[in-house]
């Protein structure tokens, strides 16, 4: 049977970046891997981030977005039926923005998927310096995306102190408690710089499994809480782009911005931008498109647009 692994987490938490490490490890084990991602955006950023691992043993498929959850789930079922015929050993899915993880378990038990697939690992990605002043809806999403995880993997741990990582885990456990979930995390949290992950680290993640956990359901449209705004081909000089990023985080009228990411050029090549309120990184990438994505709660496009004007 084909094993399905889920990688969950907030928008901008680092799920796609972790997929690069995880999928590469699987290919090195001799498995044929398919990454199934959600094509919600105006630009397929995931393809850009994953381009260096795609090849004979690692493929990517997408499910078109822009529809209601029921339609999206039907499309997912259809896609999984198609993938079952293509000889993959592992399928990695990023399900957030579609439905709760426990609802995905139900899909895998539907015929004929139950004959071809088995549930593998649920891996939750959480920022090591997780924002802790979340709305009740966002705290619920944090709890629901981690409750069934076999392991939590902290992103950007190299930028956090041990005390900050402890605080993040404590806040995660508090969010679980507040949403009626008995699950708690401790030793099952990976707190390591992803660039230093060993085969043993990734083997532990690949064997983490999933947990059965219940929590009180909160019904709302996730897109009303978290949203992402795309700004394409703005062509700001790099020094000005850095200024704009800092301005956006400081301007409360823009909404509650949690992450800014995307791609830009410095004249010599492409750079991948990843910024939070307290840190900004720019790393070379082989090929990309000029796009900046602003992620957060109650975003104000007009206020954000005003900052893009070059001065």
Which residues make up each language-model segment?
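Nucleotide-state-sensitive switch-loop elements of NTP-binding domains
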Residues: 2-8, 13, 17-135
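Flexible glycine-/small-residue-rich
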Residues: 37, 126, 275-277, 296
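C-terminal accessory "lid"/substrate-recognition subdomains
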Residues: 42, 148-154, 159-288, 299-302, ...
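Short aromatic/hydrophobic contact patches that present stacked aromatics
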Residues: 92, 227-229, 293
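Short, well-ordered beta-strand elements
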Residues: 290-296
């Amino acid at each position: 049977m084909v094993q399905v692994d889920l990688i969950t987490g907030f928008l901008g938490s680092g799920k796609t970046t972790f997929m690069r490490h995880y999928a590469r490890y699987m290919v090195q084990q001799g498995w044929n891997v398919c990454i199934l991602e959600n094509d919600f955006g105006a630009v397929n950023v995931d393809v850009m981030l994953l381009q260096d691992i795609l090849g004979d043993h690692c493929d990517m498929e997408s499910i078109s977005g822009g529809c209601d959850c029921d339609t999206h789930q039907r499309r997912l079922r259809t896609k999984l039926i198609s993938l079952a015929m293509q000889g993959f050993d592992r399928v990695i899915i990023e399900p957030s923005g579609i439905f709760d993880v426990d609802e995905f378990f139900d899909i895998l038990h539907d015929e004929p998927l139950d004959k071809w697939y088995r549930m593998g690992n649920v891996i939750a990605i959480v920022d090591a310096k997780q924002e802790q002043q979340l709305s009740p809806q966002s705290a619920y999403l944090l709890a629901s995306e981690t409750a069934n995880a076999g392991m939590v993997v902290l992103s950007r741990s190299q930028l956090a102190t041990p005390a900050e990582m402890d605080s993040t885990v404590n806040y995660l456990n508090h969010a679980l408690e507040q949403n009626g979930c008995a699950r708690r995390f401790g030793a099952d949290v990976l707190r390591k710089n992803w660039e230093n992950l060993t085969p043993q680290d990734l083997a532990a993640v690949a064997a983490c499994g999933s947990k059965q956990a219940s929590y009180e359901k909160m019904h709302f449209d996730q897109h009303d809480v978290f949203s992402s705004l795309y700004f394409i081909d703005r062509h700001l000089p790099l020094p000005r782009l850095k200024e704009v990023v800092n301005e956006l985080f400081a301007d409360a009228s823009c909404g509650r911005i949690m992450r800014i990411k995307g791609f830009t050029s410095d004249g010599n090549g492409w750079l991948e931008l990843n910024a939070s309120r307290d840190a900004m990184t720019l790393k070379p990438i082989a090929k990309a498109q000029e796009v900046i994505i602003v992620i957060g709660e109650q975003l104000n496009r007009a206020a954000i647009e005003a900052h893009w004007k070059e001065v």
